[in-house]
């Protein structure tokens, strides 16, 4: 929204009276099982600003959890959606198909890693994409088992909860979960380095550790797929050691195991590449299947599985689909989103944001030992907070910092298995001045805590 002034403004306490009134209505109408990070109700948003119903303007360093990468209500998306809504809103691609779905599949086949023939299928959410990727892998290999990793998050359906590592709030009380799911150790350089310096820097060694666990737990002969986030999202923006992912991919290829890259949070320029797999090795990583969602359509519900044609074509006709998957309005938004990323130089913009944010945070880390680690890529940067003089996770400090930042008009998110990580996911359209102001506020609050 170009007309929305790009400056922070607080005219009430956070949350203000109008948001508080809506919070009471929410409590009477919405299941209490739905959590809320910051109880301000949004009136409009654009660029790097979210304006609430009280007229407060908050600096957005969350992008709706990495969704509005190109900014809320991006002009090309608004125009494309308006045009599509006026033409038709739904027919179901499985009943009477339409060009938009095909065009999105063509674009995904073009921009995802890998030069060979590819195919795509569209769904609504990241969890649907991951679940269907597992279906496709099982169909292709004829094998049942799936391996996920420590700290992983893959969704809230039954199967993707089984793949997810963290119990609260995602899994507790919702079992039993899908069988034939196994877990392997991730390369986590900061935490690995506390035990073994070699593990922190040698990705091949960390991969050998994981493969050893996989061989003992399940064995390649029973394994359909390995599912991994190239940079973990909810787990804490963990960037594995160099060589870890290529070694796993090589093992998968040698053992007829499908390598599934969950790029739901990392995809579409977020990490300073169109996809995070591109950062791995001299030529990038070419997964067998790649799952995308979040940033794909600037906030409209859309997800996809894209991959090698021979794998994607393995399921029988009618085995994949869904009533709303690849909705025409969401497809129009996705095409406009991809065009915006490519034409507006947003991949380079993510790299600029990385330099600005990491420079600021590492400078603070040098004088504050409660910052255990600063990590991430592009506009996907995390701060791991620990108790002073130790490496013990400090979830309490993290919560206090987030709460105080919200009260000061800055939207930040927390994550991690131990709840001790601040994650920064600004829209790529945020200006340097606004981004710097948000960082100033967060850093000043941390210094005072």
Curated annotation (Swiss-Prot):
One of the record's GO cellular component terms: cytosol
Sites of N6-(pyridoxal phosphate)lysine modification: 294
GO molecular function: (S)-3-amino-2-methylpropionate transaminase activity; 4-aminobutyrate:2-oxoglutarate transaminase activity; pyridoxal phosphate binding
InterPro entries noted in UniProt: 4NH2But_aminotransferase_bac, Aminotrans_3, Aminotrans_3_PPA_site, Class-III_PLP-dep_AT, PyrdxlP-dep_Trfase, PyrdxlP-dep_Trfase_major, PyrdxlP-dep_Trfase_small
Domain of life: Bacteria
Classification via SUPFAM superfamilies: PLP-dependent transferases
Transferase listed as a keyword: yes
PROSITE patterns reported for this sequence: AA_TRANSFER_CLASS_3
Catalytic reactions on record: 4-aminobutanoate + 2-oxoglutarate = succinate semialdehyde + L-glutamate; (S)-3-amino-2-methylpropanoate + 2-oxoglutarate = 2-methyl-3-oxopropanoate + L-glutamate
Swiss-Prot/TrEMBL keywords: Aminotransferase, Pyridoxal phosphate, Transferase
Cofactor(s) of this protein: pyridoxal 5'-phosphate
GO biological process: gamma-aminobutyric acid catabolic process
Tagged with keyword Flavoprotein: no
Name of this chain's protein: 4-aminobutyrate aminotransferase
């Amino acid at each position: 929204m170009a007309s929305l002034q790009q400056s922070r403004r607080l005219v009430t306490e956070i949350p203000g009276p109008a948001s508080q009134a809506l919070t009471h209505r929410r409590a009477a109408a919405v299941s209490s099982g739905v959590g809320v990070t910051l109880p301000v109700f949004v009136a409009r948003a654009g660029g790097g600003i979210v304006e609430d119903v009280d007229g407060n303007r908050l600096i957005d360093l969350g992008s709706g959890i990495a969704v509005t990468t190109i900014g809320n209500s991006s002009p090309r998306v608004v125009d494309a959606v308006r045009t599509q809504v006026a033409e038709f809103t739904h027919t179901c691609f499985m009943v009477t198909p339409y060009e938009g779905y095909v065009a999105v599949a063509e674009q995904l086949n073009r921009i995802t890693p890998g030069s060979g023939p590819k195919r795509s299928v569209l769904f609504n959410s990241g969890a649907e994409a991951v679940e269907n990727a597992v279906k496709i892998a099982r169909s292709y290999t004829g094998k049942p088992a799936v391996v996920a990793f420590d700290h992983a998050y893959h969704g809230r359906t039954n199967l993707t909860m089984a793949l997810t590592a963290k119990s609260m709030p995602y899994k507790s009380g919702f079992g039993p979960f899908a069988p034939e799911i196994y877990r392997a150790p991730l390369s986590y350089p900061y935490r690995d380095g506390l035990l073994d310096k070699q593990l922190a820097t040698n990705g091949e060694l960390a991969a050998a550790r994981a493969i050893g666990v996989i061989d003992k737990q399940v064995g390649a002969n029973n394994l359909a797929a390995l599912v991994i986030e190239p940079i973990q999202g909810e787990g804490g923006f963990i960037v594995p050691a160099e060589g870890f992912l290529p070694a796993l991919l090589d093992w998968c290829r040698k053992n007829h195991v499908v390598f599934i890259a969950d790029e739901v949070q990392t995809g579409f320029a977020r990490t300073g590449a169109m996809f995070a797999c591109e950062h791995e090795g001299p030529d990038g990583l070419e997964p067998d299947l790649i799952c995308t969602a979040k940033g794909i359509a600037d906030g409209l519900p859309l997800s996809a599985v894209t991959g090698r044609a021979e794998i994607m074509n393995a399921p029988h006709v009618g085995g994949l689909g869904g009533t709303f998957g690849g909705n025409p309005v969401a497809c129009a938004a996705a095409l406009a989103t991809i065009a915006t990323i490519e034409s507006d130089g947003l991949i380079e913009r993510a790299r600029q944001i990385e330099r600005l944010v990491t420079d600021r945070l590492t400078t603070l880390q040098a004088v504050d030992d409660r910052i255990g680690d600063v990590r991430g890529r592009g506009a996907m940067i995390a701060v791991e907070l620990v108790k002073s003089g130790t490496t013990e996770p400090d979830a309490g400090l993290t919560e206090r910092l987030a709460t105080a930042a919200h009260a000061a008009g800055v939207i930040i998110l927390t994550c991690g298995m131990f709840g001790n990580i601040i994650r920064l996911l600004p829209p790529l359209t945020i200006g340097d001045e606004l981004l710097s102001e948000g960082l100033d506020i967060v850093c000043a609050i941390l210094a005072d805590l």
